[in-house]
Structures are given as C-alpha cells and as structure tokens.
Amino acid sequence: MEPILAPNPNRFVIFPIQYYDIWNMYKKAEASFWTVEEVDISKDINDWNKLTPDEKYFIKHVLAFFAASDGIVNENLAERFCTEVQITEARCFYGFQMAIENIHSEMYSLLIDTYVKDSNEKNYLFNAIETMPCVKKKADWAQKWIHDSAGYGERLIAFAAVEGIFFSGSFASIFWLKKRGLMPGLTFSNELISRDEGLHCDFACLMFKHLLYPPSEETVRSIITDAVSIEQEFLTAALPVKLIGMNCEMMKTYIEFVADRLISELGFKKIYNVTNPFDFMENISLEGKTNFFEKRVGEYQKMGVMSQEDNHFSLDVDF
C-alpha cells in the first residue's frame, strides 16, 4: 500500500503539515486564482469577424474540446483521486484544482457563447463529446482512465498526459493567434489557463515522485506515446492546424517535445529527443515551472498569498 493512499485518521485537519513540497504547490495554485470576470473579451468580436471561415472553424472546435475536457478532469478528481489520496496537503490541491477547472470550463463556454450566435451551432459545440468524432476520441481516452482498474500511479500518468499533452497543441495554436495580434480576450485567458494546467501537470509529477511502487518505465512510455499519437492525429488530420496557417509537421514535433519534457520530469529518459520548433512557445511549453509562474501572467497573482513574511505572528510589535 502506498503511504499517500493509506488510511489517515488525521486527514480532516491541515496542521501540522507533513508534506511541505505538496503544500507549497497548493499555495502556489491558490496564489494564481482568477475568475472569468477579469478577462475582457469585448474586443474579440471585431477580430472574430475578420477571421477566415477556416480560422473560425478551427477555433470553435478547439474551444469545444476544451469546454468538455475540464469537466472530465473534474470527474476524475471527484470520483477517484480525491477519495483515494489520503494526505491532507494533496486533497487541498485537488479541491482547489476542481474549482480552477470549473473556471476554465466557464471561460471556454463563455467564449463559445460570445463568438457563436447561432443557437443550433452553439448546442453542437457544447455537446462536442457526442457530436464531434475528433473530440469524442480524446474524451473517450480520458474517460476510460477514470474507470480503469489500474493503480493510482498509472492513472496519475494518464491524467498528466491529458493535461500536459492533450491540451498542449491547442494552447500552442491559440498562442499562435496571439503572435499575430488577434483575439486579446481569448489569448489572455489562454495564458492564464495554460499556466494553471502547467501547474496541475507539475503536481502530477510531484505526486508520482511520492510513490514507493510507481509504474514501470515501459508502462509510463506506453501511456504517453498513446496520448501523443491521439493528439497528433487531432491537430494534423481531424482538425489540422494548417487551417490557421500553422505547419502540421512542426505541430507534431512540438507535441513530441512536450511529451519528452513530461517524461523527463517524471524521471525517465526522453522518447523523441526533439527540439521545440515554436520559438514563441519557449517560455510556455507547459513547463508550468516557477520561471513561467513567477512571470505572473498578465501581472496576475493574488496579493500576499505566496508572501512568507505575512505568516509570522509576534507579540513584540508596538501597538
């Protein structure tokens, strides 16, 4: 039995902290909280109306995938991870992650609602898991892992792949629009969401390091390469990025680059050994590490949450 999954009678009380590295991840997530009301999408409509039909088609399908996927991640957290993991610090993170995923889902739904005026098309996009085969394939893969009988370690890798690989190419495609100076609301929300997902992915890697009996390297490689092939097919065949003027072969390479970064973070050898083909993704590539986080995307970070000085109470102060 993994220690982090073992029955823990102290799980209802936060202090004393036992796992400081996990607790610090929770505080980092807390410091980056945001809401959809803080994203101004009013200027997007002018840009939206100037996009080509292909560009609109691409963005709508990407948003449809995103709108559904956060709910799938949350279902896994609610049904599996939150009940399995018994250490309080990780439960704090997972609870906060669920709130953040709801905000992501609301943001994507609001973007669809703003850009798409036809109610039938809206319904089609909101029900992408049933209506779009390319989205269904990714959703089915993620949902399969919620109900899989595999151990926590394997499912941890699968959902790290969902958040680290299944989202990566779509994030890159929206950053490509930012490079062109288009859709400021969409691209700003993409910065916030990609930062959050990078942190969630880092958290999965941290939890993996706490396992005493992790899955084998062969198992990890199998899950990650499976996710890579599905994501490559999604963005080069089902919903090709050439629709927005991106190079499909470079996108394939980028997804492999992101997968290598993930598997390295898990402590294993790289699979693809490729370099990042997108210079504009240099600081983003779902690294989720402090260098990206501390940029405080859009200068946004909750005041004082990460400030250590505020946490000390002294009776020596002159009142």
Curated annotation (Swiss-Prot):
GO molecular function list: metal ion binding; ribonucleoside-diphosphate reductase activity, thioredoxin disulfide as acceptor
Listed name of the protein: Ribonucleoside-diphosphate reductase small chain
Gene behind this protein: OPG048
Catalytic residues of the enzyme: Y108
Similarity remark: Belongs to the ribonucleoside diphosphate reductase small chain family.
Record PANTHER family: RIBONUCLEOSIDE-DIPHOSPHATE REDUCTASE SMALL CHAIN, RIBONUCLEOSIDE-DIPHOSPHATE REDUCTASE SUBUNIT M2
SUPFAM superfamilies according to UniProt: Ferritin-like
Induction of expression: Expressed early in the viral replicative cycle.
